[in-house]
Structures are given as structure tokens and as C-alpha cells.
């Protein structure tokens, strides 16, 4: 079942997006200025890890092991070395397991 968001909540969301727009565009500009083609991803990954950590997210990094993903649907043959291919993920871990109290 879809949750309908009232117009006041939508207005607040849009206002917050607008308020942070210039900062978001600067971050995107800084990110795309970093060379990040295959084999050169580490600086861009570090940039994103720092940005996500600044937001309070828990950072997880791991090296891609091609043998562990080879059997997965959609796997594409690897044509370049993955020696420096590191995945970076930021995860929000709430302070409590309680969901939205308004629901």
C-alpha cells in the first residue's frame, strides 16, 4: 500500500532540497573532477567515503573478488585488473530499532 504524503510535508522536503542545492552541486562538481576510470577509482572512492562519514554514516569498504561474483546473474567478463577496485558503502544505522512513530 502506498503512503500518501501530505502537501505540507512535501513543501518541507522541497524546501530542504532547495536549501542544500548549491552545496549538493558543489559536491557533485568536486566528485566528477576526480579521475575515476577503471583502475583510478581510489581517490573518488575516498572522496565519497569522507563525504558519507561526514553525514554520520558507517563506512564499509571491501575489495572486489571477481571469483565471488562470477556466478551471479548479470556478471560481465572482467577485461581489466581489479587490483585497486574497492567498493565503498555508507550505511545509516539508527540509534534505536523503533520505526516511524507516526505510522
Task: Report the location of each language-model feature.
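Acidic/His- and Gly-rich active-site-bordering loop/insert found
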Residues: 2-103
Amino acid at each position: 500500500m502506498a503512503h500518501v504524503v501530505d502537501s505540507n510535508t512535501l513543501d518541507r522536503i522541497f524546501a530542504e532540497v532547495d536549501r542544500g542545492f548549491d552545496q549538493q552541486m558543489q559536491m557533485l562538481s568536486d566528485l566528477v573532477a576526480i579521475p575515476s576510470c577503471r583502475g583510478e577509482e581510489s581517490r573518488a572512492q575516498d572522496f565519497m567515503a569522507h563525504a558519507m562519514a561526514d553525514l554520520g554514516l558507517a563506512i564499509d569498504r571491501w575489495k572486489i573478488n571477481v571469483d565471488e561474483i562470477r556466478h551471479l546473474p548479470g556478471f560481465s567478463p572482467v577485461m581489466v585488473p581489479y587490483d585497486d577496485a574497492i567498493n565503498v558503502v555508507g550505511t545509516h544505522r539508527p540509534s534505536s530499532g523503533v520505526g516511524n512513530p507516526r505510522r
